[in-house]
């Protein structure tokens, strides 16, 4: 969990038995302290490894099978991925939730050999977010503007996806 903030995602993953261990990192010490308090509150502190890290720089490859990067801009997510060679191992899965610059991130991913396997939208309160599930295939490709702006969202049939597409069309 890159950019863990208060550690809620890490705790949720453990509580819901999605995984039995989580490495959560943040670039600042204060969010890591908050994440430790959250882990202690929910009794999972023995299964969370917290690391002070700029992106994935302090995360050993052995601790990063699935990589989750949420709540950052698309350019920062691309930078984090570009600085970490092991994200290009085909066994790794990426879950990315960009807050801004989504077309930039899609272009980066596709042009550097990542495949966007699926996209979905989710609504939290009044905000609609897009989530990308990606993996490295080594197949680099250029994408057109339509795909850069909409990705695989038009294929999704959920109400959240329709809401996301409407929101994006109004923004353009």
Which residues does each predicted region cover?
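Conserved SAM-binding motif I beta-strand of class I
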Residues: 21-26
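S-adenosyl-L-methionine
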Residues: 33-62
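Conserved Rossmann-like nucleotide-cofactor binding loop
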Residues: 30
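Conserved SAM-binding loop of SAM-dependent methyltransferases across substrates and taxa
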Residues: 6-19
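Short SAM/SAH-binding signature in class I
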Residues: 64-71
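Class I S-adenosyl-L-methionine
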Residues: 57, 63, 75-171
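Conserved beta-strand/loop positions that form the S-adenosyl-L-methionine
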Residues: 2
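Short helix-capping segments at alpha-helix termini
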Residues: 17-18, 40-46, 86-89
